């Protein structure tokens, strides 16, 4: 089986299930494949290049409805994480913390159909800004957000870890607000597959579900943080220093 993921900590359960042997314990031969961006995840699922994948939680609904792509029925198996995102700003804005003053700012978001887009729009609108006309919202793959912040191409981003912590680690940005302070308990990423895959392979899907759920239960316990950071840090997975992942 081929499972896609974006190299962010939201994908922790489905990534860690690979090195920790949770897939093989269910009798599955799984390849987890790092993917550059969310549009590519969508396209590879529609084209059946992936059997299952890491999704942004709004994506299965958007794909099923044909928003931004041909309509293809998709299902959410599990929500992989809640909260865990942040608005990170360039260091030059450290004294400009009031969003009312952010007219003209350029922000990166990972995808149109994302909680990141919805939460950033909500936050800006609460401050009296029109997200469509007063600021620029640009779709940028999460792995490119810190580089764009450093280059001055954007003023900030609402994105996933490890890239908020990476911006702090590299001293190019600071965390302005955590998304749990905008909506505590909000869903973020999901694990899912096509309706067709579930119907054709119900036992395989059930085994996949059990493997990811087992990993999620382990990831929920803070005492496992260091071990999990160690197994997801390598280049094949998140390609991040363990220090960034444990912060």
Regions found by a protein language model. Name each.
Residues 86-88, 190-193, 197-198:
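Short glycine- and hydrophobic/aromatic-rich loop-to-beta-strand nucleating segment
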